[in-house]
Amino acid sequence: MELLTFTCCPFEGQMQQKKRRFDANLVQLQESEHRNDQINETVDAELTNECWKLYMRLKPSNEEVSRRQQFVDKLRTILSTEIKDAKLDLFVFGSTENNLAIQQSDVDVCIITNGSKYLNSTCQLAQLLYSYGMKQIVCVSRARVPIVKIWDPQFDIHCDLNINNDVAKINTKMLRLFVSIDPRVRPLGLIIKYWAKQRALCDAAGSGTITSYTISCMLVNFLQTRNPPILPAMLDLMSNDDNKMFVDDIVGFKEKATLNKTSLGRLLIDFFYYYGFSFNYLDSVVSVRSGTVLNKQEKGWAMEVNNSLCVEEPFNTARNLANTADNPSVKGLQSEFQRAFRLMSENNACERLCKICEEYQFLDITNEANYGNTNTPFNTAYESFGCNHTVLPEAAAYPKPYYPPQITLSDGGNMNFLYYIPDESNHQSYENKANRDSDFQGQTSLTQGSAPPWHYIPCQSWLVWYPSEDASNPASGN
């Protein structure tokens, strides 16, 4: 099919700006670093056992893994069918590929054009996917990395797609390699990711916190700085072969990791203590690349803006992954680490995990219509603990476009699609067609049998009228 070039993308949207997660006036940090969390071997074993149980509930089922793969295969088929250019390729990155995905995580896909002239914008990609029945399409072309957000009703998969962001492939390989070194890494990663999601800590664009990739790097660096270390420095994993990025043989790294006998449950408590009390936010930089904690002054980041938390990007050391969080947000993050540590120290094994992952409730809740269905299998993660948690899938963090009711175009010829943009300062009643005719702002022809371009309704304040059996009832986005 011929991909159109848009002057104004009909799928254009933007990340929903939600309420800030942390209020600077409400965040209170604990000054004391006294540890009162000594646990005996029995309690340690119970906590570790509960961690493994939660991990088994959080990781995607075989059925979900299969659906994800079928969805990716479908995307490949769409590209090869409609854009017959051998230069185009796609790869999956992020949590799906690095083995840190929890149930109902989005699938992240990057399309590599390799100089192809047939696909050069996210708006063109959105148009192509719309023609293949993808729903809830939002094109965010003005983001630092432009993306297209979609939902495939066939496989019930939410997906974020970008074009030519190939650095994501390297980051994904790095995390996947770290996860494969020690069997404690993946359970820790999934539990911490779930905790961060429940506590609304990984929404950099929406509420000024950090990304899940950033907190994964913080976990890796925590494990690198244990004594003895569980994970090596990233530089130690780099290959001398110019044709590949990382080494293939990691047996030696696995053997070194076994020298650290700390249990899974103990590591989880230590992680929260480390970033709640021990880590020096004022002077330190998390460095996965070196496997150490760098000095902020020596790195030249002491005077940078939004540097209260510094997490070095492993492959672009000039970039701070945590610069999405300002000073109040970083203090809020630290307070959440402290809260988790306190709760992990005060309760029995079952209650510890249940309490730290209680869902954070914003005081000013956005209209629930924007958030998708929360009655999902993911809500059963804590079923055995007797906890009532509401879990939102990743894609539920973004509002869904308004979709008018489906109609069937009448047979024969072309039809006009008319839309009305109301003047909100002089809102009036539109109970009959006569009142609307004088206010029509524009129209576009539709070929008989084609679907009306519902995505030409990017904001909820538009009123739409279209030819149907009941012309007196326009679809309203209000």
Curated annotation (Swiss-Prot):
SUPFAM superfamilies: Nucleotidyltransferase, PAP/OAS1 substrate-binding domain. Its main location: cytoplasm. Belongs to the DNA polymerase type-B-like family. It comes from Schizosaccharomyces pombe (strain 972 / ATCC 24843) (Fission yeast). Its cofactor is Mg(2+); Mn(2+). It catalyses: RNA(n) + ATP = RNA(n)-3'-adenine ribonucleotide + diphosphate. Residues 428-447 are annotated as: Disordered. The keyword Thylakoid does not apply. Pfam families: MTPAP-like_central, PAP_assoc. Mg(2+) binds at D106, D108. Keywords: ATP-binding, Cytoplasm, Magnesium, Manganese, Metal-binding, mRNA processing, Nucleotide-binding, Nucleus, RNA-binding, Transferase. Its EC number is 2.7.7.19. Residues 263-317 form the PAP-associated domain. This is Poly(A) RNA polymerase cid11.
